[in-house]
């Protein structure tokens, strides 16, 4: 092959390569709005890294009725990670009452006070009991009729490895006004979860909105200061998490208008850890719409 043909081949290859590389769009919106979303995203990253964030979960262990010994030794009913004492103690589950008894020679703390025998409150009571030894923290969760130990390690390696979550370019066009359509009475909707079970929840109404000339509707769940929405769309399993994303909104205004800002839609905790118990979108909240806003997939899960 002569030199001129080689040069033509190189130029053609470069042209094809450059034309296949799409430049990501610049943020779209007022400077104030763009700054607001950037600040929201930064705070989201900070929350994930906290001791109470989702990044440091290292275990989820379901309890059986009766005694449940736990620690790093294989002789326990529940094996904790190797950086824990061989036997930490025992959790006794009897008729929904949970009691902790520590093993001899192990310092277990509750609110920085050493405890040897303590009644435990689960996470649904609003006054959950958290215990600690070394860098480990654990408490009881209740899901359906089951109780489990949720374990954290505040020195988990992922805290150092985690840097950020990719997001779509901020676009104020994805800040959409929806109409709240109340259900009277509130409708019971089925919410599946990652554990393979389904629970009922009250939906006070649906949120109806228009995008690209088409109408869409999402069933909302009541939250403390507005609504909580679990949804999936045509990016799910491709660019975003396959099991959907979460979105919070404010309460409806006097005209029953609710703002859906998909730029702050975010990944469920199951993206970051297999030890979370995430709800999944109800089937009616799967949208035939590509929502290119908010958080993208993190890691290798889809």
Residue locations for each model-derived region?
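C-terminal motif of bacterial Sec signal peptides marking the signal peptidase cleavage site
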Residues: 16-19
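N-terminal beta-hairpin/loop module of FHA
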Residues: 32, 36-84, 234-235
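Flexible, glycine-rich surface segments
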Residues: 177-236, 241
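Bacterial N-terminal signal peptides that target proteins for export
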Residues: 1-8
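Extended, aromatic/histidine-rich regions of cofactor-dependent oxidoreductases associated
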Residues: 161-167, 236-238, 257-259, 263-302
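Forkhead-associated
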Residues: 63-128
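Bacterial signal peptide processing site
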Residues: 21-23
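Surface-exposed beta-loop interaction hotspot
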Residues: 132-199
